[in-house]
């Protein structure tokens, strides 16, 4: 076959990868595809909750991830999630194509896939495509809004100490540089009372309050915040709301406009399993013109959402790989994913509660948590627990030694097996036993 024919075939396949409708064969190789189609037919009548405990269904999904057989068990998917192998392969193929002639294939071929991708992301989020900007992560998305809104000296912004660190730093920088007032609430999580949280934000409001910044799912311990109730309360006082959806989009079953916020930013490389370094910004259409772009644009006061995509040279392979992640995600379904991951979290957390010396720092009730939970072992610092889990048991978690939290964050994903969680529980049991008062007393004798 000629080089020209090869290239034409490659481009055709690339287009299919970016926008093709989901099919079992597009997720797995031929063997897995047949199995998945059979499972889908068999479990079609199951509710998401019923399907959450059907291990033969999920074992097929698990085989789509190379991470499921990695030497280190990754239980920090809240930080960044691996992509299914087909997403990795798509990015690799797009990268190969780009390197055949970067300026041509990136700008004139792959870049043409952005508008179809925008439409598909909007469909998943229940939004207008003209409200969706594609970028690299939640920090970039939310910093666009944080730095893009006009505020005057003395104007107040309300957040909390458990918002994501990069967002807190952005507000503190504006406070230091421009003289705005950044007020932060403190909470004792877990909280199983929405009204208590809403009231805390309400009581912090003054006549100078302009913005409330709220995190949908608290990244530290997984608390789900009552975003819709906070937004409604804020709007009653004429206050805009910025929503950090880094840990909710692609995991919780919701539509962005239903939250009733004004601005929403997320990373796509968490529970959507998109390529690492992909994100999204949503701005309510009538608010777009008032937000200055984070990076320069020729029409900064435009109503066109694309003014927030002036990133210069970016990774088009990563951006277009989002399309395959959407295929994979939509093949499962958001509600099915939510119920499965919540089941996995409760599976290990409920058993961990039976281990003497182990404490869970997260609610196990559905309205208040999903994937993430914090765990601690008496007698161990968070960093000591994290280090022991990794060095002795090859389990990767992340220590959270922050404010009133002293725990390790654990976050499974759809590729996590029950046997993986059993391994984690055995490790917790061993470490809790070694650090029990009885054993510690014997060591000191």
Give the predicted meaning of each segment:
Residues 2-445:
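Pyridoxal 5′-phosphate
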């Amino acid at each position: 076959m000629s080089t020209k024919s090869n290239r034409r075939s490659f481009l055709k396949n690339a287009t299919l990868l970016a926008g093709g409708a989901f099919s079992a064969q597009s997720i797995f190789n031929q063997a897995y595809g047949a199995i998945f189609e059979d499972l889908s037919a068999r479990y079609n009548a199951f509710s998401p909750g019923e399907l959450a405990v059907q291990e033969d269904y999920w074992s097929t999904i698990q085989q789509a991830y190379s991470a499921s057989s990695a030497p280190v068990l990754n239980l920090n998917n809240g930080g960044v999630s691996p992509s299914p192998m087909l997403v990795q392969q798509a990015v690799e193929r797009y990268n190969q194509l780009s390197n055949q002639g970067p300026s041509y294939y990136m700008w004139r071929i792959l870049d043409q896939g952005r508008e179809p991708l925008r439409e598909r992301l909007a469909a998943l989020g229940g939004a207008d495509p003209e409200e969706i900007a594609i970028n690299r992560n939640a920090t970039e998305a939310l910093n666009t809004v944080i730095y893009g809104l006009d505020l005057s000296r003395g104007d107040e912004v309300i957040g909390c100490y458990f918002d994501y660190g990069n967002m807190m730093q952005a507000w503190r920088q504006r406070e230091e540089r421009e003289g705005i007032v950044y007020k932060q609430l403190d909470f004792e999580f877990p909280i199983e009372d929405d009204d208590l949280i809403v009231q805390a934000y309400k009581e912090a409001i003054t006549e100078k309050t302009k913005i409330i910044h709220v995190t949908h799912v608290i990244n530290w311990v997984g608390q789900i915040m009552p975003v819709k109730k906070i937004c409604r309360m804020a709007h009653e006082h004429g206050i805009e709301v910025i929503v950090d959806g880094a840990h909710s989009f692609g995991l919780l079953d919701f539509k962005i406009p239903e939250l009733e916020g004004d601005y929403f930013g997320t990373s796509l490389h968490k529970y959507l399993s998109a390529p690492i370094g992909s994100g999204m910004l949503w701005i309510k259409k009538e608010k777009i013109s008032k937000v200055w772009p984070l990076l320069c644009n020729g029409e900064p006061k435009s109503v066109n959402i694309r003014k927030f995509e002036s990133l210069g040279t970016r990774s088009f392979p990563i951006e277009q790989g989002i399309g395959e992640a959407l295929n994979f995600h939509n093949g499962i379904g958001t509600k099915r994913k939510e119920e499965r991951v919540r089941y996995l979290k409760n599976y290990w957390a409920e058993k961990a509660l039976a281990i003497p010396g182990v404490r869970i720092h997260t609610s196990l009730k559905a309205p208040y948590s999903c994937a993430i939970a914090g765990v601690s072992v008496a007698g161990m610092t968070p960093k000591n627990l994290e280090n022991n889990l990794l060095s002795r048991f090859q389990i990767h978690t992340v220590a959270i030694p922050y404010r009133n939290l002293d725990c390790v964050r654990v976050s499974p994903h759809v590729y996590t097996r029950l046997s993986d969680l059993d391994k984690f529980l055995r490790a917790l049991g061993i470490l809790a036993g070694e650090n029990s008062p009885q054993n510690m007393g014997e060591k000191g004798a």
